[in-house]
Amino acid sequence: MPFRTLDTADLAGKRALVRVDFNVPVDGGKITDDTRLRAALPTIRYLSSKGAKVVLLAHFDRPKGKVVPEMSLAFVAEPLSKLLEQPVAFAADCVGPQARAVVDALENGGVALFENVRFHAGEEKNDADFAAQLAENGDLYVNDAFSAAHRAHASTEALARILPSYPGLAMQRELDALDAALGNPKKPVLGIVGGSKVSTKLDLLRNLVTKLDYLAIGGGMANTFLHAAKIDVGASLCEADMADTALQIIDLAAAAGCKLLLPTDVVVAHEVKPGVAAYTRNVYEVQPEDRILDAGPDTVATLLAAMDASQTLIWNGPLGVFEVPPFDEATVSAAKHAAKLAKSGKIVAVAGGGDTVAALNHAGVSGDFTFVSTAGGAFLEWMEGKTLPGVSALEV
């Protein structure tokens, strides 16, 4: 996809409206995880160093088009200022005279944060008039919030079509990584899709089987595929009503030349709790009272061999109930092997989705993957092959 890049922009003295994701977790008015603030720092610093007036647009929570004082972004200004090591001015609105006054007072290289864009109903309606009001305070637009790119909102889509628009540095890095994983990957490509339900990942599976050489299915959704293949999964989580759909995906994979890797052995227990008695069984030997909670060692060995044979890995969803040891072993083994291959340059390893990020953190390897996306819904919709409005609006 062709985009303008910030290094080609004339920035000195220009007002740069920058869409960031500051929808941070908060407890008692304090930010408990500042990852999203830190993700925006390179773009803010770059623009500031080039003499731009940096004006930050963001949403927080779901005020539904009304001013809700406890959903104000005012609390972000001070921690952001500390991270940047420079003052951050706060405007009590994102449009109108209050916003204009703060921007007018900025010196070149200065930074301002506007109030929650979702305090205006026009934001989530992608309203052209509201976008035009936002645009009054900018000479150019930068979107650095890939995590909000699947939403066609005024600050992510309509605004990008009014001003000269650019992806921010974090957005560009995400787009480059995703292109390397699915857009234009080195083959063979292996996908790992885990999680509990087939029903939540139907579009994902249908899209991936047409693009991958191998697809390993794990987690609770693997039970549905085993059930569809007339294999008894005992007392395991299983969407029996999705059996026909699972068979359709098996047929789609066969037609596309994608090799499906389903569990051949599993780790079972009678309940999900730490320290419970766990057993490894061949999938054909699962007992009526067994609950499948992880992939077995033979299944993992097959998966690692597929990794060794691949040049690209894309991963979404854990292979078992990784939060409860010992049912984390398959996920941890696969994650560590992928990280080792990525670190040595043998594979491009891209992962994303909330549970996946948590699983890689649990395995202690998220820093060794080529790229780990924290974008959640946007990452999933991209994997499903859907157009992301906030990305397509940036195309030249």
UniProtKB/Swiss-Prot annotation:
<comment type="pathway">
    <text>Carbohydrate degradation; glycolysis; pyruvate from D-glyceraldehyde 3-phosphate: step 2/5.</text>
</comment>
<dbReference type="Pfam" id="PF00162">
    <property type="entry name" value="PGK"/>
</dbReference>
<keyword id="KW-0067">ATP-binding</keyword>
<dbReference type="GO" id="GO:0005524">
    <property type="term" value="F:ATP binding"/>
</dbReference>
<comment type="subunit">
    <text>Monomer.</text>
</comment>
<protein>
    <recommendedName>
        <fullName>Phosphoglycerate kinase</fullName>
        <ecNumber>2.7.2.3</ecNumber>
    </recommendedName>
</protein>
<feature type="binding site">
    <location>
        <begin position="59"/>
        <end position="62"/>
    </location>
    <ligand>
        <name>substrate</name>
    </ligand>
</feature>
<feature type="binding site">
    <location>
        <position position="323"/>
    </location>
    <ligand>
        <name>ATP</name>
    </ligand>
</feature>
<dbReference type="InterPro" id="IPR015824">
    <property type="entry name" value="Phosphoglycerate_kinase_N"/>
</dbReference>
<keyword id="KW-0547">Nucleotide-binding</keyword>
<dbReference type="GO" id="GO:0006096">
    <property type="term" value="P:glycolytic process"/>
</dbReference>
<dbReference type="GO" id="GO:0043531">
    <property type="term" value="F:ADP binding"/>
</dbReference>
<keyword id="KW-0963">Cytoplasm</keyword>
<dbReference type="GO" id="GO:0006094">
    <property type="term" value="P:gluconeogenesis"/>
</dbReference>
<dbReference type="InterPro" id="IPR001576">
    <property type="entry name" value="Phosphoglycerate_kinase"/>
</dbReference>
<feature type="binding site">
    <location>
        <begin position="21"/>
        <end position="23"/>
    </location>
    <ligand>
        <name>substrate</name>
    </ligand>
</feature>
<feature type="binding site">
    <location>
        <begin position="353"/>
        <end position="356"/>
    </location>
    <ligand>
        <name>ATP</name>
    </ligand>
</feature>
<dbReference type="GO" id="GO:0004618">
    <property type="term" value="F:phosphoglycerate kinase activity"/>
</dbReference>
<dbReference type="InterPro" id="IPR036043">
    <property type="entry name" value="Phosphoglycerate_kinase_sf"/>
</dbReference>
<comment type="similarity">
    <text>Belongs to the phosphoglycerate kinase family.</text>
</comment>
<feature type="binding site">
    <location>
        <position position="151"/>
    </location>
    <ligand>
        <name>substrate</name>
    </ligand>
</feature>
<keyword id="KW-0418">Kinase</keyword>
<feature type="binding site">
    <location>
        <position position="118"/>
    </location>
    <ligand>
        <name>substrate</name>
    </ligand>
</feature>
<dbReference type="GO" id="GO:0005829">
    <property type="term" value="C:cytosol"/>
</dbReference>
<keyword id="KW-0808">Transferase</keyword>
<feature type="binding site">
    <location>
        <position position="36"/>
    </location>
    <ligand>
        <name>substrate</name>
    </ligand>
</feature>
<feature type="binding site">
    <location>
        <position position="201"/>
    </location>
    <ligand>
        <name>ATP</name>
    </ligand>
</feature>
<keyword id="KW-0324">Glycolysis</keyword>
